[in-house]
Swiss-Prot record:
Pfam families on file: NST1
Ranges of Acidic residues composition bias in the record: 242-254, 542-583, 666-681
UniProt biased composition (Basic residues): 16-25, 268-277
Bias (Low complexity): 26-45, 317-330, 368-388
Function description: May act as a negative regulator of salt tolerance.
Family: Belongs to the NST1 family.
Entry keywords, A to Z: Coiled coil, Cytoplasm, Stress response
Keyword flag Kinase: no
Official protein name in the record: Stress response protein NST1
Provenance organism: Cryptococcus neoformans var. neoformans serotype D (strain B-3501A) (Filobasidiella neoformans)
Biased composition (Basic and acidic residues): 531-541, 654-665, 682-694, 727-750, 760-882
Length: 1353
């Protein structure tokens, strides 16, 4: 312990002095290694060398020396341009006798002219992250004290600073604005402190915005509980502050507890401790520190600002807490600032404080930027040493302190993250200051005073202008002037002492230097050396340490180091880093903190301004903490706090005498006051001591400000010297460079002259060589020109020769071309002659053919006219009989018709549903078959076209001759096969090639319910395509409509007159027949016809259903679907006996069985509107008696056409002679299955030989077998050709032989020789053909047919 001065320390109570003496004694007995070297007393052994001459900028910040921790914090953070740009600093122009040292690793802050000039001037990310790491580790310690009394003890400007710094969002108490209710609020506060520190350290908004993105997501929810809120706001613990130690278990248990839910600290009974004689020794032993435990979880709400205990190591956190920042990779970007929160309403100041404030009580919307010391209090990773006391030149060893119960062991606070000046800088400033003259020193101090006064006046501009405030301003200026005068005297005396010490006559003056009031603070804010006025420690009675019994602080108490001093002895937790330790006691004690109570001192009556800024007797440490902060703010052009300090100094000046008098009257014995511990206060200082302490505080402020001023002057001097040195070096370098250039120029000139001579010689040699070369080139050119002329002459001769040869070749080619053209012309003329003769022959043959055809057509027309007249008369008669019959039958069948109609409608509905379902399947099958048929038809058409072209002329003659020579007897077998007799007059049908049919148009089939019971009639769709032209010469009787009443009911024609079955050929889709088809009515099949006699047309491989009774020879071949398509069937009808057997009825239902299908089409694929043939429908009697509707597979009309069916145009059929089967166009049976020569208006097959009751509609009737026309008027017919109806079964016109007389004469059904199925005469009226249900339909049909016939005629 230093013993420079034996005088009692000023500004300290006896209890504090005793405590310090006791600590010093224990530290001297237990020396420990120093945590950091003490550099303030070091003197440079030798003058450091000057910086290198290569520094180009006279303002290069490299010579601003700010080394690491352990030195005084001279921060270059103020605005030089605004602070020092108005006054010229008088510098000593003479030689600088002192030595100085320059550090080239300077780190500057924003706001300085030198900031940003070099990369080393910015702090690293690692430093900032380390500071933030320590900050977050200290955030959530629940043991930090928080009480209103402590907050109230703070000066108004400190409280206002905290309010402006952190806008809290939690619940705010009346006197504590910094309370928060959640860890998130604490996290935001830490972020703001980091941001402020980053801005103060020169990082700017960009870097401080994202300081800690590397923190994992849980860091927000679980911050590290190692940083105090007070330290976050820029208030550090006093360097001598340590956690209190307990001497007995009773006090340890007494002080334990947690803050209550409402924010109040746990109440602890304030017991008056008595002296314990016997137990003092046992309680003096130090308590062993417990194992590190995780901090107890803080309550949900903490309404007070936690006080900052000694830094403790981070405890073992639970597994869910985030990893410490020190273990995480550093982030490249600073932490983003938290969302702005609404600032709480500040505590309204007292009337006295409000009168001293120049502005309103509301905090400014944008508070002034905090200094680096005030805003960036986040500790860094380096632990600072706390090993020096005021006035001590030695270091105290750091000893381990037993951690109190319920708390984690303490660790040294980390170092500050910005750089500070070192002892070498301080020595350089001292040497520079001593080297200045008296006038220069006075000028520097005057400049400093004027600058401070100017700042203060600028602050006064915004203050009140009343007389009271005016007097206050005058007092402040007077006080400031007097203080600076006193400080100048101190500077002069301190400089004299330093000069004497420099000569070695006496030791150097106490204090950190180089000026009176200077203190040295390391990077973490720990005071390492104090000012020269700092009081020394002396031994005192240990009983007076704490105002309690002497046993409380025994000699065996374990004080770790300087930080063991109680916070309440020397200041608050939020004391700034530059606080001195030799300060008076704080305000009245806080009974519920975790610190021991202060010794009871009777507080004297406070003056009116007793709680002001300079209440040195009770709150000096806090004020001195603010002194360095005020100085830093002044350096940053913020003089608000300085103005407050000066206002309070002026107030203190006015009440000083009164206070001195009051203090003298209230002095009592100090020992008695210490024993009276009810109030727990220290003895206040006297007014003189307070004045001295105030002067000391101002010296600290002025020294910090003046250090910057002198440092600026020193830097300017160094910069000027460096600039001069640099200019000299540059000049020398220029001279050297100029000399070298002159030397180089001379040498270059010599080289140029030598090279010039060499070039001239080389040029002469080159000219000689060029002259020789030029002559040689001229000779070569002459030779070349002569050779060129010779070559041109030879080329001309060759060109003339080639042209002559070419002309000869061209003449020969022209002659050959003319000869070839002549031959081609002759050949063309011969071909044209031959073609002309051929055309003449063809035209002649065509005219003859047309003449014959016209003759046949004329004959046929006449026959049709005769037939039409007869048919008309017959229809009238039949219509009359029909009406009479219908009237008789209508009444009898009306009841039956209704019942049958209802049943039939149900059956028809079910059948149509089934038809629709099977229609889709049939369409698919037909599409496949249609593709096959189209391919076969294409091949067939090609073969037919070739055969027709070659035999066109021959076929015409053969057809004429064949039609003339056919005997009548030859037609008998055919008629016998059909159950007919040949007509009395044999007709001579002539086979003519039918006109090619156009593609049919799909017609929609519209079903019409017929009145016939048990039968649902449907409208027959009309197909619009031409039919084959009848042979020339064959009489056409279709003009005479065949009335339905001309025959017996069993022999009715299958097609009504006027139906498409009787239609003549149509030209371009229009009907030219006298009886166009009726589009709404169809006839049922005659009862006497076999319903099962169904055949497929030519080209479709359907197996025909053979009729009852065996028809040999031609019938088999004609009905066999296995016969090749287009191959004529040459077998003729063998005899008429077999036809007779058909008529006789001696046949069996199963004699005529279907043969296997042809390979072209499957058996189940038929033309549109035709039912499929199956064996199940060929049984005779059962089918005849069946009254059920037709099977659902009979798709009617165009409904059978699929969307992908191709409309095939049948080709012209190949003519045949005699009984040969003509070649049918493939698919013609599909579209022209009508039994009439004129074709049907719809693709409806021929009527079946059905039994009574099974009367399918026209659309359901099957077609004839291949090669046979089973029309009602089946006259003489060549197999495979459609012929007009010349009478026949059931007609009124006579056929061949006696068949026409028998059948044509008797319509009543008594002579039934024309029936195919059943008995002769088995038809008749008994079959119900003309039943009443047909009457209305037949009447309308007959009327329409008659009208059409009349219109066409």
């Amino acid at each position: 312990m230093s013993s420079k001065s034996q005088q009692p320390p000023t500004g300290l109570s006896k209890s504090a002095a005793k405590k310090r003496a006791k600590k010093a004694a224990k530290q001297s007995q237990n020396p420990q290694p120093q945590s950091a070297p003490q550099t303030s007393s070091q003197t440079p052994a030798s003058v450091p060398p000057l910086p290198p001459a290569s520094v180009p900028d006279p303002l290069d910040p490299a010579f601003f020396n700010f080394p690491g921790p352990g030195s005084y914090p001279i921060d270059v953070q103020y605005d030089d341009t605004a602070y020092y740009d108005q006054v010229d600093v008088p510098l000593n122009q003479g030689d600088f006798p002192g030595s100085y040292s320059i550090d080239y690793n300077l780190s500057l802050q924003n706001g300085s002219q030198l900031a940003g000039l070099s990369a080393p001037f910015n702090i690293t990310h690692d430093d900032l992250i380390s500071a933030a790491n320590e900050l977050y580790k200290r955030m959530a310690d629940p043991e930090f004290g928080s009480d209103d009394a402590y907050w109230s003890s703070l000066p108004p400007h400190i409280r206002q600073f905290i309010r402006d710094a952190v806008p809290f969002t939690g619940s705010i108490s009346q006197s504590t604005p910094g309370t928060t209710s959640s860890q998130r609020t604490m996290y935001q506060m830490a972020q703001q402190i980091v941001q402020a520190a980053s801005q103060g350290m020169g990082l700017g908004h960009g870097m401080s915005a994202n300081l800690m993105p590397g923190i994992n997501a849980n860091a927000r929810s679980f911050p590290s509980p190692q940083q105090t809120i007070g330290e976050e706001f820029g208030f550090h613990r006093h360097p001598d502050t340590r956690e209190e130690e307990y001497d007995d278990e009773e006090e340890i248990e007494e002080d334990q507890g947690h803050p209550a839910a409402n924010g109040d600290a746990p109440k602890k009974k304030n017991k008056k401790k008595k002296k314990k004689g016997a137990n003092a020794a046992s309680l003096s032993a130090p308590v062993e520190p417990p194992a590190p435990l995780p901090p107890l979880p803080p309550p949900s709400t903490l309404s007070k600002i936690p006080r900052a205990p000694a830094p403790v190591p981070q405890p073992q956190l639970p597994t869910h807490q985030p990893q410490p920042l020190s273990q995480q990779p550093p982030s490249l970007n600073p932490l983003p600032p938290p969302a702005p929160a609404s600032a709480p309403t500040p505590t309204p100041p007292s009337s006295r404080a409000a009168g001293k404030q120049p502005m309103g009580t509301n905090p400014p919307a944008n508070p002034p930027a905090r200094s680096a010391r005030a805003a960036g209090k986040a500790p860094a990773s380096a632990a600072p040493p706390h090993n020096a006391h005021a006035g001590h030149s030695h270091n105290h060893p750091s000893t381990a302190k037993p951690a109190p119960k319920g708390k984690s062991p303490a660790t040294a606070p980390p170092a500050k993250i910005w750089t500070q000046s070192s002892a070498e800088d301080r020595e350089n400033i001292r040497v520079f200051w001593l080297g200045l003259s008296e006038a220069e020193r006075r000028d520097l101090l005057r400049i400093e005073k004027d600058a401070v006064l100017k700042k203060m006046k600028e602050q006064h501009r915004h203050s009140c202008g009343c007389a009271v405030c005016g007097r206050k301003k005058v007092n402040i200026e007077m006080e400031l002037d007097q203080l600076y005068e006193q400080y100048y005297d101190e500077l002069r005396s301190y400089a004299a002492e330093q000069r004497v010490a420099a000569n070695g006559l006496r030791p150097p003056p106490s204090g950190a230097g180089p000026f009176p009031g200077s203190v040295e603070v390391d990077a973490s804010g720990t005071v390492t050396q104090y000012d020269h006025r700092a009081p020394e420690l002396h031994d005192h009675d240990p009983d007076d340490l704490d105002g309690e019994e002497s046993e409380e602080y025994d000699d065996d108490d374990d004080y770790a180091d300087d930080d063991e001093l109680d916070d309440d002895d020397i200041g608050t937790d939020e004391a700034d880093v530059g606080d001195e330790i030799d300060e008076p006691p704080p305000p009245p004690p806080i009974t519920h903190r975790q610190q021991p109570r202060r010794p009871p001192v009777k507080a004297p009556p406070r003056s009116e301004g007793g709680d002001d800024f300079l209440s040195f007797g009770s709150n000096l440490a806090t004020i001195k903490g603010g002194i360095l902060t005020i100085a830093d703010d002044m350096l940053k052009n913020d003089g608000t706090k300085f103005l407050e300090m000066m206002e309070q100094l002026a107030i203190r000046r006015s009440v000083r005498e009164e206070q001195n008098l009051r203090d003298m009257q209230e002095e009592t014995d100090e020992e008695e006051e210490e024993e009276d511990d009810d109030e727990s206060r220290d003895e206040p200082m006297t007014e003189k001591e307070r004045a001295e302490e105030g002067k000391r505080m101002f010296q600290i402020f002025a020294a910090r400000m003046f250090e910057q001023r002198v440092l600026q002057a020193y830097r300017e001097r160094v910069a000027k010297q460096r600039e001069e040195q640099l200019l000299r070096e540059l000049e020398e370098e220029e001279d050297s460079k100029r000399a070298k250039e002159e030397k180089k120029a001379k040498e270059a000139q010599k080289k140029k002259d030598k090279k010039k001579a060499q070039k001239q010689k080389a040029e002469e040699e080159r000219l000689a060589r060029e002259a020789a070369l030029e002559e040689e080139k001229r000779q070569a050119k002459l030779r070349k020109e002569e050779a060129e002329r010779e070559r041109m002459r030879r080329q001309d001769e060759e060109r003339v020769r080639r042209e002559a040869v070419k002309r000869a070749a061209q003449e020969e080619a022209q002659r050959q071309a003319l000869e070839r053209k002549r031959r081609q012309q002759e050949e063309k003329e011969r071909e044209e002659e031959a073609a002309k003769k051929k055309r003449e022959r063809e035209e002649k043959a065509k005219k003859e053919r047309e003449a014959r055809e016209n003759e046949l057509k004329e004959k046929e027309r006449k026959e049709r006219e005769i037939k039409a007249a007869k048919e008309k008369a017959e229809k009238e008669r039949i219509a009359k009989e029909t009406l009479e019959k219908a009237e008789r039958d209508r009444l009898a069948k009306e009841a039956k018709e209704k019942a049958e109609k209802i049943r039939q409608e149900r059956l028809e509905a079910s059948r149509m549903e089934k038809v629709r379902k099977e229609e889709a399947a049939r369409k698919e099958r037909e599409a496949v078959e249609q593709a096959k048929i189209i391919a076969a038809q294409q091949a067939q058409r090609e073969r037919a076209a070739k055969a027709e072209k070659n035999t066109a002329d021959k076929a015409a003659a053969e057809r004429i001759s064949a039609a003339r020579v056919i005997p009548v007897a030859a037609t008998a077998p055919v008629l016998a096969t059909l159950g007919l007799k040949s007509p009395s007059k044999g007709s001579t049908p002539q086979s003519a090639p039918p006109v090619p049919q156009l593609s049919p148009v799909k017609g929609a089939a519209r079903p019409i319910t017929n009145a016939t019971p048990g039968r649902s009639m449907q409208k027959t769709p009309t197909a619009y395509y031409p039919q084959p032209v009848p042979p020339v010469g064959v009489a056409s009787f279709s003009r005479m409509p065949l009335a339905q009443s001309f025959g017996p009911p069993g022999l009715r024609p299958a097609y009504p007159t006027g139906s498409p079955a009787y239609s003549p050929p149509r030209a371009n889709g229009s009907s030219i027949s006298p009886n166009p088809p009726s589009r709404g009515f169809t006839d049922p099949s005659p009862p006497g016809f076999d319903h099962n006699l169904r055949t497929a047309p030519i080209g479709v491989g359907f197996p025909p259903v053979k009729p009852s009774g065996r028809i040999p020879s031609m019938a088999d071949d004609a009905f066999s679907p296995t016969a090749p398509i287009g191959v004529p069937v040459t077998r003729s009808v063998s005899s008429a006996g077999e036809m007779g057997s058909l008529i006789s009825g001696s046949v069996t239902p199963d004699d005529y069985r279907p043969t296997p299908p042809a390979p072209i089409a499957p058996p189940n694929l038929g033309p549109i509107g035709r039912p499929s043939f199956s064996d199940g429908q060929t049984s005779g009697p059962n089918v005849l008696r069946s009254t059920s509707p037709p099977p659902p597979d009979r798709v009617l009309g165009s409904a059978a056409l699929g969307a992908d069916d191709e409309i095939v145009q049948p080709q012209q059929r190949r003519p045949t002679t005699s009984w040969d089967m003509p070649t049918a166009a493939p698919g013609s049976g599909r579209w022209s299955a009508s039994p009439s020569i004129w074709g049907s208006g719809d693709p409806t097959p021929a009527p079946s030989w059905g039994a009574p009751g099974s009367m399918p509609t026209v659309a359901e009737r099957p077609g004839p077998p291949p090669g046979l026309s089973l029309s009602p008027g089946a006259g003489v017919n060549v197999l495979g050709q459609r012929q007009p109806s010349f009478g026949g079964i059931g007609s009124s016109f006579g056929g061949v032989g006696a068949v026409g007389s028998v059948i044509g004469g008797g319509m009543g059904g008594t002579a039934g020789s024309g029936l195919v199925q059943g008995h002769v005469g088995g038809g008749g009226y008994s079959q119900g053909l003309f039943s009443p249900q047909h009457q209305q339909q037949q009447q309308l049909q007959l009327q329409l047919q008659l009208q059409q016939q009349q219109q066409q005629q």
